[in-house]
Design a protein with these regions (language model features):
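Short alpha-helical donor nucleotide-sugar binding micro-motif in glycosyltransferases
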Residues: 165, 278-279, 286-291
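Acidic donor-binding loop of glycosyltransferase active sites
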Residues: 289-304, 321
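Carbohydrate-associated surface elements
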Residues: 177, 199
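N-terminal subdomain of nucleotide-sugar transferases
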Residues: 1-65, 112, 166, 170, ...
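Conserved donor-binding/catalytic core segment of Leloir-type glycosyltransferases
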Residues: 209-237, 249
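Short hydrophobic beta-strand element within catalytic cores of glycosyltransferases
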Residues: 313, 318, 322-325, 335
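Conserved acidic donor-binding segment of nucleotide-sugar-dependent glycosyltransferases
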Residues: 336-338, 342-349, 358-364, 379
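Nucleotide-activated donor-binding/catalytic signature segment of Leloir-type glycosyltransferases, i.e.
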Residues: 261-282
């Protein structure tokens, strides 16, 4: 047995500012003593990074992509095949494209040389494609965490996802809704899907429901359709028309930024609404602490994309800022109407405006929601507890005891 067994995290892009849950998970594993290698299939184009990124001790490897022409790619595969006896069988029996095959071969060489005993990917897209191929090449097991777009989007090919589920040693997903969806749709292939919520390092999210709050309605997320921010702008126009004192700030960047700014201008909301662009996690936390409420008016997008369970809801509830959201996928598992938050129908700007007004004007309600929300987060979304569950799965799937001191992986 390898005296220092290692787990490989296979990610499409690392680091990625919007995927704080991956960073939190990696840091929790490291605190428990798990040795990790991080493999990134694409180079990040983010220009802002979270301060916690500097705490990651695990080595990060960029996996080389396909060569500039087919001949060079074939030559690279031939070179890898000298060290990977199963490679040509996988190439001939796979319908994967050349880039995925070459990255899988490169990854395979690395994980064998570095004593990797198991691979874990986040999102059932290219990271899982490459991990699955590498598993076939090396015989090293793989698992993945399914989130949202990777299982709901209209571009998801059912047979391809079914094969990823069936061939994996285990699948984690981030909401009970997702578990039921996958089991209903993929039957036996998804029978072993396990719910483990994305978690937070609660030491970094001190609870402060009675801080110096502004009449600020905050939205945080990528500027894409499924976040529903256009309805938050419509709700802002309704609140302004009623003379409610407030400001609305939306933090994040994305493909709809120009459209949302045009909507701000068209509704003449310049004095009430600001699109802030992307921010670091520390700056986002400060915004959450200042805000009276967090609005996440999520919707089912036209391409069937939707949120799984937005991390920003967990962060806001942990910090003591009450939330408003919609009954999309796993959100009702954390936002229980009138108990841990307020719920409105998706695409209903009037209901959203009314809910915002309630929280802007009812301090007692805000305090009650905040207290209940924090209790729920502590009970179900502590990253140290949830990462220990993940390590226990890694131990089971690899056949190697990965437990360390403290909570490290045992159940």
């Amino acid at each position: 047995m390898n005296p220092n067994p290692r787990i490989a995290y296979v990610l499409k892009v690392y680091p990625r500012t919007s995927q704080t849950f991956v960073l939190s998970e990696i840091l929790a594993h490291e605190r428990a003593g798990l040795e990790l290698d991080i493999f990134s299939l694409r180079r990040t184009d983010d220009t802002r990074f979270h301060a916690e990124l500097a705490q990651v001790q695990s080595p990060v490897f960029q996996v080389a992509r396909a060569r500039s022409n087919a001949t060079l790619t074939l030559n690279a595969l031939r070179e890898h095949a000298q060290h990977l006896p199963r490679l040509w069988d996988v190439v001939h029996n796979s319908q994967a494209n050349a880039e995925d095959l070459l990255q899988a071969a490169t990854l395979s060489r690395a994980i064998v040389e570095r004593g990797i005993i198991h691979m874990h990917a986040h999102f059932g897209t290219v990271a899982t494609v490459v991990a699955r191929l590498a598993s076939k090449i090396t015989g090293i097991s793989y698992s993945f965490t399914a989130h949202a777009k990777d299982i709901f989007h209209e571009n998801v090919v059912e047979e391809v996802l079914r094969n990823k589920l069936a061939d994996s040693s285990g699948v984690i997903t981030v909401s009970r809704f997702n578990v039921n969806y996958l089991r209903d749709k993929y039957a036996e292939a998804a029978a072993g899907v396990k719910l483990i919520y994305n978690g937070l390092d609660l030491d970094k999210f001190p609870f402060d429901p009675d801080g110096d709050k502004l009449p600020l309605v905050l939205g945080v997320g990528r500027l894409v359709e499924k976040k529903g921010f256009s309805y938050l702008l419509d709700a802002s126009a309704l609140m302004r028309a009623k003379g409610i004192p407030f400001r609305c700030e939306i933090v994040g960047g994305g493909e709809l930024e120009a459209d949302l700014q045009e909507q701000v201008n068209k509704l003449d909301l310049g004095g009430h609404v600001t699109l802030c662009g992307a921010m670091s996690q520390s700056d986002v936390k400060q915004k959450i602490r200042q805000a009276r409420l967090l609005a996440a008016p999520c919707v089912h997008a036209e391409n069937n994309d939707r949120d799984g369970l937005p991390t920003i809801l967990l962060e806001s509830m942990a910090l003591g800022t009450p939330c408003i959201s919609t009954p999309v996928t796993g959100i009702p598992e954390v936002l229980k109407p009138g108990e841990t938050g307020l719920m409105v129908a998706e695409r209903d700007a009037n209901a959203l405006a009314d809910a915002c007004e309630r929280l802007l004007t009812d301090q007692q309600l805000c305090t009650e929601l905040a207290l209940n929300g924090r209790r729920l987060i502590e009970d179900q979304f502590d990253i140290n507890k949830n990462a220990a569950e993940i390590r226990a799965l890694f131990s089971s799937m690899s056949g190697v005891d990965l437990s360390r001191g403290g909570d490290g992986g045992g159940t």
